[in-house]
Amino acid sequence: ERKLQAQLFALEPYRSGRTPAVFVHGTASSPARWAEMLNELQNDARLRQRYQFWFFTYETGNPVLYSAMRLRESLETALATVDIGGQDPAVRELVLIGHSQGGLLVKLMAVDLETQLRADLLSVPLEELRMPEETRELIRRVVAVRALPFVRRVIFLSTPHRGSYVAGGWLAHQLARFVRLPGQVVRLTSDVLESDPLLKTRLESGLSSVHGMTPGSPLVTLLAPAPLAPGVTGHSIIAVTGDGPLEKETDGVVAYTSAHIDGVASEIVVHSGHSVQGDR
């Protein structure tokens, strides 16, 4: 079965002067899940004239940091392609919208964590590890978590900033065993097992996105408290299914206490299940 390739695409040709709004879907999903929201946005003439809508698709079973690398590099390539001379200020006002796991990818575009990631993952400097240069370069790319200078606004929908209790469940971890990782990641794992005991431990704790979104995982422990970079405005849309105290509510997949983060400009709580992007 052919693996889904990470890619960034637009529904229409690039239009100068319109700010890209990039939608990033969640686990076991696809860009098609944004259809209802997209229809609503396109029916608003004011929004339609101000924004152009792009979509990022990826294999959601891959490690979160690996998928974030693909998103980061896709955005950088796209902007360099559509605005070669740097003459369109609209592309430097990018809006990112992420649902569920997609929200984690979005946040990784708006925080500076490279130094902490290197310290947490590696017991010795990357340059001192004995491994093929190809593997070393892939690690550099994966941990290069720096706020992209053209991202100005991020919107989180039902995002498990502190992990999902569903991802931490027995069934999820059994299913994660069947995830087929990209060849790059498999080779990286093999090389690392022979070079760095600390990184070996991190890798053996689980490579798939399911493990990365487990409450208490190294990734969410580091990412949840990380502040958005200066100049980036954040918004949270959090779904709950009940009417009880928010700290006890969930959307069936993500608890309110996981979706809530400090430092955002606004937080809207709606009554919905986890697939809030398809509800009106």
Q: Positions of the model-derived regions?
A:
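C-terminal catalytic-base region of ester-bond hydrolases, centering on the histidine
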Residues: L171-R280
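Short, solvent-exposed loop/turn segments at secondary-structure junctions
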Residues: A28-S29, T60-G61, P160-R162, A239-D243, ...
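Extracellular/periplasmic catalytic domains that process cell-envelope and extracellular macromolecules
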Residues: Y14-S16, L47, D88-A90, I97-G98, ...
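Alpha-helix-centered segments that form part of catalytic cores
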Residues: E12, S16, A144-R153, G206-V220
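Flexible, membrane-associating and regulatory peripheral segments of lipid-active enzymes
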Residues: E1-V22, S30-E36, Q52-F55, V82, ...
